[in-house]
Amino acid sequence: MPPAERRGPRLLILPAADRCVGWTLRAANGRQLGAGVRTYRSEDELAEAVRELIIERAALRCTVGQSEGRLWVWTAHLPVRSTRPGAGEAVAVARSARGYLRRDQCQAAVEAFLTGLQWIGQELRRSGGRRPW
C-alpha cells in the first residue's frame, strides 16, 4: 500500500517561538494524542529526539495527575541515562494535549498516545529511516 493511502496517527511539526519547532501527535481523525514538552532549534534536532522517543518508548514512564484546574493530565518521562548517583530525575518528553474530566479517560489517552508512537515507529521503519512526517 503506498504511503499516501495509509491512515494512522501523524506527527506534525509546529512552529514555536524564536524560530524553534515543536511537535504534536494526532490520530487519523485529527484528534490530538499528545505533544512534545520542549522545542528544538531545527527539524533535524527534533527528528533525532522523536527517533529516540520511538526507540525508547518501552522505557517511558507515564504519570497521570490532576492539574490546577482539576482536569486529569498525563506526562511521559524518559529515564536519565547516567550511572552517576544523583544524576537527576526522569526527563519529561511528552504531555497530554488537553485535560480530561475523568481519570479513566486520561489513562485511555495515554494508551492512545503509546499506540500512536508505535504506529509512527512502524512507519519510520517502513520508510527506511526517512521521516514519515
Give, region by region, the residue ranges found by the protein language model:
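Mixed-charge, glycine-accented linear interaction segment located at domain edges/termini
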Residues: 97-133
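A short, exposed loop/beta-hairpin motif centered on an aromatic-Gly-Thr core
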Residues: 31-43, 85-104
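A compositionally biased, intrinsically disordered/low-complexity signal enriched
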Residues: 33, 50-53, 93, 113
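Short N-terminal "domain-start" leader segments
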Residues: 1-18, 22, 35-71, 79-85, ...
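Short, ordered coil/turn segments that flank beta-strands lining enzyme active or ligand-binding pockets
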Residues: 17, 28-29
